Swiss-Prot record:
Main location: cytoplasm
Gene Ontology cellular component annotations, sorted alphabetically: cytoplasmic stress granule; eukaryotic 43S preinitiation complex; eukaryotic 48S preinitiation complex; eukaryotic translation initiation factor 3 complex, eIF3e; eukaryotic translation initiation factor 3 complex, eIF3m; multi-eIF complex
Source domain of life: Eukaryota
PANTHER family given in the database record: EUKARYOTIC TRANSLATION INITIATION FACTOR 3 EIF3 -RELATED, EUKARYOTIC TRANSLATION INITIATION FACTOR 3 SUBUNIT B
Organism per entry: Meyerozyma guilliermondii (strain ATCC 6260 / CBS 566 / DSM 6381 / JCM 1539 / NBRC 10279 / NRRL Y-324) (Yeast)
Lineage, highest ranks first: Eukaryota, Fungi, Dikarya, Ascomycota, Saccharomycotina
Protein name in UniProt: Eukaryotic translation initiation factor 3 subunit B
Amino acid sequence: MCGCVGVISNVDENFQVKTIVTMSDIDYEALEKEVPLDDIDFSDLEEQYAVKPDFGIDNFVVVDGAPIAPEAKVPVLIKVLKKLFSTVGEIVEGEEGIHMPLEDGKSKGFLFIQFKTAQMADAAIQQMHGKKLDQKHRLLVNKLSDIEKYGIEGNVPTEFKEPEIPPFKSHGYLKSWLQDEQGRDQIGLHYSDTFGVYWNKRKSPEPVIEPRKGFTSKYAKFSPKGTYLFSIHPQGIQSWGGAQFESISKFIHSQVRLIDFSPNEKYLVTLSPQPIQVPENPAERASYPFGPESNGHKLVIWDLATSEPARTFALPPHLEGQKEMPWPLVKWSHDDKYCARQGPGALAIYETPSFQLLDKKLVKIDDIVDFEWAPAPVYLDTSSQNGPGEHVLSYWTPESSNQTARVALMQIPSRQVLRTINLFQVSDCKMHWQDEAKYLCVKVDRHTKSGKTIFSNLEFFKVTERDIPVEKLELKEVVINFAWEPRSDRFVTISRLDDGALNPAIPKNTIAFYAPETSKTKGGAITSSKYKAFETVVDKHSNTVYWSPKGRFVVIATLARSNGELEFYDCTYEEENVRTTSKNNVKLLKSEKFSGMTNLAWDPSGRFVAAWSSSWIHTIENGYKMFEFTGNMLRDESIDNFNEFLWRPRPPSMLNAADRKKVRKNLRTYSAQFEEADAMEADAATRQLILTRRKQLEEWRAYRAKHASAGHQKKEDKMTVIEEIKEEIIEEKEEIVE
């Protein structure tokens, strides 16, 4: 690059001639290489031309609500307020730090505080706004920039402007799967990082939507009635629904681990180990679903209709830091009207939708260990059978130095204790409500006086009878599993003898099927007496009981062991050509092995059972198997990294008693239709044959309808009445004639 140098003569204010050398088009890069700039000291220039930081008004806050004090006491008041606000940020030194205006010899009730940074001012607003200085004064803290923004006339429009309401977005019919012509159920399959929803078919599942990778970061879960599907992500929860499982709502709750629902799908409960932190930035805070009152809380109840938080809670101190969290922490009444949380020595019962404490106070129950809501309305002996029923919960308290263990029933909202029993030498209690809330079974694990041996008692509360009688069933063994039959008074237990021999290879568990003994009175009425085992199976490894949702059939399984097994029982088996008045007849239908089985679940109809081995627990035979209720295996799918199998729940049937009776009456007709559909699905040739026969039948019916009028009319036969005489022998007598 070429350059040129010019000489310019100039005359200064003293009329002295100065020569100025100018350069243009110089190769500055070459010049920088020749002159090392790093060696030049610019500190004097930087100091001379340094620009002082402009604090601006974002560093100022206006504090209103301060006491009005005489001028003589203002320095003391400023000292107190400075000490208070210095806890949240550094205040500028000197008179610039705090300014309290005076008028007529006294303060005006507000002051200005200048912090060193805008972040400190934000922290002061967050922590000090609404703080009580004393009983008469509450401090109101705002940014000075907000006062200027909203306080100056003209900055805020005085005319009301209608807010823009976004157009309604339809998600389709959220219960569309119930309209399936074949009445099929839907299943969810989660393997590796892929989740898919499928129609359950006998031969192979049919995708409802394309399986999605990265659908959830942890697990997926259907709501209790199947309306929504929820996925979990680091940012929170996502709900999906409709025929194509479109996105419906997002629930922002960072690092959620556990979720739960109210029975009628009105509310969602989430728990995160990470406490809620409301952003300090006003723009971020505006879109954040939680307010400052939720800071530090970990448990959130959401309104599913609005996707907004209804209430947040801090964890009780005794649960903080626990690795294994008891779940759910919030338990619901059958109709979502009440929910309750257990704390040290008390129950907190809340009314929905306000989520305010019932009667604005806790229910004091010293040393309460656990509680359970009745899963259905309770019709007490004093209740109207046509009414809505009562809300009842049960709870138990342990033994102490001066009182026995107790189990009690309490009516809500009156808090009336309906029934109490006292128990001795109690190690643990588990409460099992029957699904119709007619019975409550309390499994009481008791110990001998030496404390070396454990055995179980079963205490049965007959809730609907007068004065709620309690029946005791004493056992010599420890009950490790208990399950009521749906809509019945029968139940199954799995127990073992606590003899100190804990060799897991030796099968020692006993399966027992119980029902109340019944007898007829002289008037023909049936009365039930004490519970009695009508069938027992000994020396088993079985540890879990799964009743069909429709009752009668039950699967007794061995889970989480290398020798997994399923046993299918019919508890009302009717033998051919054998008449019996008892319905308590157990028959083992089939037994199937499934090594490594970790979970088992019935479909909502009670027709199918799914068992699976989850890679979340181990890597043995991961996949799932599908069975009929009789134990006949339909599918055996081995899937690498298989995580979870989900049945989509169904809402309760809307058929009344008359409709159900009609279905049962025509069951053979419906059964033939389903068998035909199964045959068509199983074999392509059979399907084609059935379709051909259907077509031929339709053609024949159309032909008959077309030519029915072309036939000859039948001639009327002429009738001739013929007189007939009939003789009737009334009496016949024989005589001997000599």
